[in-house]
Regions:
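Metal-dependent amide/peptide-bond hydrolase catalytic core
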Residues: 1-6, 190, 197-415
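N-terminal helical capping/dimerization or prosegment-like subdomains
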Residues: 1-96, 273-277, 292-294, 390
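Short helix-capping segments at alpha-helix termini
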Residues: 54-55, 140-144, 171-172, 302-308, ...
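A structural signal for isolated positions on well-ordered beta-strands in alpha/beta enzyme cores
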Residues: 60, 85, 149-151, 312
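Active-site metal-coordination/substrate-binding segment of hydrolases
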Residues: 81-149, 382, 388
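Short beta-strand segments
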Residues: 87-88, 151-153, 179-182, 201-203, ...
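Acidic-glycine-rich active-site phosphate/pyrophosphate-binding loop
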Residues: 95-111, 175, 190-202, 336, ...
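Acidic/histidine-rich catalytic neighborhood of metal-dependent amide-processing enzymes
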Residues: 123-194, 237, 406, 413
C-alpha cells in the first residue's frame, strides 16, 4: 500500500509533461552519422539545460570521445543515505530505410496511445522517466534520504564508450544500486546476457574469375568457418539448455564483406581477403574463456586439413553475463513499488542483450535492475513506439521504488 508521502510523489509525476519531454527527446536526431558528424550532442545540450532549469543543479558534461558526450548530475537530499543511479543512453540506432516507416521516425507522433519514433522506447522514454523521477524527489517536498545520480551517457548502441568513461572517471564509485529504464515492458529484469564480439579475417589469393584455380578463394574458407561455428552453437544450445530468463546462447555472423572495405569489388575478380564480424551471446552456464578457446580450436582444425586456410580471429569486446537476486534491496523496493502502484504482481525476466548496466555490475559490483517502458522485442525496428500508459506507469513505479530504496538501505560504499 502506498503511504501518503508516496502518493504525493506519484502525483508529482505529470503525465502530460512526461509525454512532452519524451516527444522532445525523440524529435532530436541522435543517430550517430559519421558522414555528417551527427552525434548525441544536441540531446545532451537539451538534457543539460533541462537539469539546470528543473533540478537547480549544475550538470557535468564530459567527452568520452571527440563529439561523444555524457551528461551527469547529482541530486542530494541533504540527508545521509545511499546513492541510487538512474542510467540511460542518449544515442539511438539508425532509422534505416524511411519508406519502411508508416510514421515520421523523428516526428514523435501519438496515434492510438502509442508514441512513435526512433528511440521512443530505446530509450528516450527511459531517459524521460529518469529525469522526472529525479525531479519529483527533488521538488515534491516529500522527505527522502541519500542521493540520486543521473548518468545519461553516449554510445550504448556502439562499444559502450560512454559508460566505460563514466566509470573510469569515478562517477560510479559511490553508487549503491542502479535502475536502468531500458524497454522491458516494465518487467523486472534480474540478469543480462553476456556478449563476445569477434573480428575474422580470412586471407586467400586474388585470381581472375575465369581462372579460380590460380588463386585461393577466401569466401569458401569463410563459409566453412560459418558452418563450423553453427555446429558449435548447436552443441552449446544442447549443453546449456534454455536459461530461465535469458533463453539460449547464440552465435551470429552480423557482417560479411569480401573484399573488405577499401578494396573495390569486381564481378570477375576472386578477392584475396574476406572480413566478418561475429556477435556471440552467452548465458550463465558458459565460460567466456572456454568459448574463445573453442572458436580458436575450430580455426586450428580447419587449418590442419587445408594448407591454404589462413584465418585470424580477434576478440574485440567482452561483456560478461551479470545477474542479481530477488533479495537485493533495489529489487525488493522495485517489486513492492510495482505491486502497489499498478495493483499487479511484478513479472521477473532477463535482458536478451547487454546494457550499460553490464559494466556497472561487472566492473564495480553495483546491483543493476533493468526495467523500463516499451516492447521488449521492438527496439531497432521500423515504427518503433512506446505505449503512453506504460510510460506513465514506469515513472510512477520508479519514483516510489527510488524513495523506498533510499529510505530503507544503508550505503555499502560510504557514509
Amino acid at each position: 500500500m502506498l503511504s501518503d508521502a508516496e502518493r504525493r510523489l506519484v502525483a508529482a509525476i505529470d503525465a502530460d509533461e512526461l509525454v512532452r519531454l519524451t516527444q522532445d527527446l525523440v524529435r532530436i536526431d541522435s543517430v550517430i552519422r559519421p558522414e555528417t558528424g551527427n552525434t548525441e550532442r544536441e540531446a545532451v545540450r537539451y538534457i543539460a539545460a533541462w537539469i539546470r532549469r528543473e533540478l537547480g543543479v549544475a550538470p557535468v558534461v564530459e567527452e568520452a570521445a571527440p563529439g561523444r558526450e555524457n551528461v551527469i548530475a547529482t541530486v542530494d537530499s541533504g540527508r545521509p543515505g545511499p546513492c541510487l543511479m538512474l542510467e540511460g543512453h542518449t544515442d539511438v540506432v539508425s532509422e534505416g530505410a524511411r519508406e519502411r516507416w508508416t510514421r515520421d521516425p523523428f516526428g514523435a507522433e501519438i496515434v492510438e496511445g502509442k508514441l512513435y519514433g526512433r528511440g521512443s522506447c530505446d530509450m528516450k522514454a527511459g531517459v524521460a522517466v529518469a529525469l522526472l523521477t529525479a525531479r519529483a524527489l527533488a521538488t515534491s517536498g516529500v522527505p527522502w534520504r541519500g542521493k540520486i545520480r543521473l548518468g545519461l551517457v553516449c554510445d550504448e548502441e556502439g562499444m559502450m564508450i560512454g559508460i566505460k568513461d563514466f566509470i573510469r572517471r569515478g562517477h560510479a564509485d559511490d553508487v549503491d544500486a542502479c535502475l536502468v529504464p531500458e524497454p522491458e515492458e516494465n518487467q523486472l529484469c534480474l540478469s543480462m546476457k553476456g556478449a563476445i564480439r569477434a573480428k575474422l579475417i580470412v586471407t586467400g589469393r586474388m585470381a581472375h574469375g575465369a581462372m579460380p584455380l590460380t588463386g585461393v578463394n577466401p569466401n569458401t574458407r569463410l563459409a566453412r568457418i560459418v558452418l563450423a561455428f553453427e555446429r558449435f552453437e548447436a552443441a552449446e544450445k544442447q549443453r546449456c539448455g534454455a536459461d530461465e530468463f535469458l533463453g539460449l546462447p547464440s552465435i551470429t555472423f552480423t557482417v560479411i564483406q569480401s573484399p573488405p572495405p577499401g578494396s573495390p569489388a569486381q564481378l570477375n575478380v576472386m578477392p584475396g581477403e574476406a572480413l566478418a564480424y561475429v556477435d556471440i551471446r552467452t548465458v550463465a552456464k558458459q565460460d567466456h574463456e572456454t568459448v574463445r578457446a573453442a572458436l580458436r580450436g575450430i580455426l586450428a582444425e580447419l587449418g590442419a586439413v587445408d594448407p591454404d586456410f589462413k584465418a585470424s580471429l580477434e576478440f574485440i569486446e567482452d561483456r560478461p553475463v551479470v545477474a542479481i537476486g530477488k533479495d537485493e534491496p533495489i529489487v525488493k523496493a522495485s517489486a513492492s513499488a510495482f505491486a502497489d502502484v499498478t495493483g499487479r504482481p511484478p513479472v521477473y525476466n532477463g535482458v536478451p542483450g547487454a546494457t550499460d548496466g553490464t559494466f556497472l555490475s561487472a566492473w564495480k559490483g553495483i546491483p543493476c535492475l533493468v526495467n523500463g517502458p516499451g516492447p521488449r522485442h521492438l527496439p531497432h525496428q521500423a515504427d518503433e513506439y512506446v505505449e503512453v500508459t506504460e510510460l506513465v506507469e514506469a515513472a510512477r513505479v520508479y519514483v516510489v521504488a527510488a524513495h523506498r530504496f533510499l529510505a530503507s538501505s544503508v550505503s555499502r560504499r560510504r557514509d
